Amino acid sequence: VHAVGDRAVRESLNGMQYARKKNPNSNITHSISHLQLVNPQEFPRFKQLGVIASMQLLWATAESYTEELVKPYISAMTYQYQYPARSLHKAGATIAGASDWPVSSPNPWNAIAQASTRKGPLGVLNAKESIDRESMFYAYTLNAAKALRLDQQIGPLAPGKQAHLIVLDRDVFKV
């Protein structure tokens, strides 16, 4: 499900809760994409319902969109929870990394860096919602595979799993 605003997120979670109640033996993996605005009351529901938070954290930046087109129209409390990666993670949600391609770059390195710094041309967007690089590596590997229901085939480097490897010229946890 694609949900940007807090009401859309709440209604999506309500729908997924209803689906789980009506089909308790279903192995369907539910996920919500984008999650720009999430009410803190909803954070624990992601874990409770097994809903994956599919986040495009390349957008978690202080720029004209977030500062001029969003901030004036929402409450201060709502504003402080834009792209609430850390809060969702701390509440036990599974964070999956994703792009918003073709609207933005599909390059995961950019999103991983952005998720940890949240820096933009107009400052930092809610630094307390930054998330560490290690968590973002899981988001773009194992957790993304879970969101696609491919975690039995891909995700971590493990015996019997498919893998695409790259060789890097630096320690990406220290860049």
Regions found by a protein language model. Give the residues of each.
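Short, internal active-site loops enriched in acidic
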Residues: 5-8, 37
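Aromatic- and carboxylate-enriched substrate-binding clefts and catalytic-loop regions
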Residues: 28-39
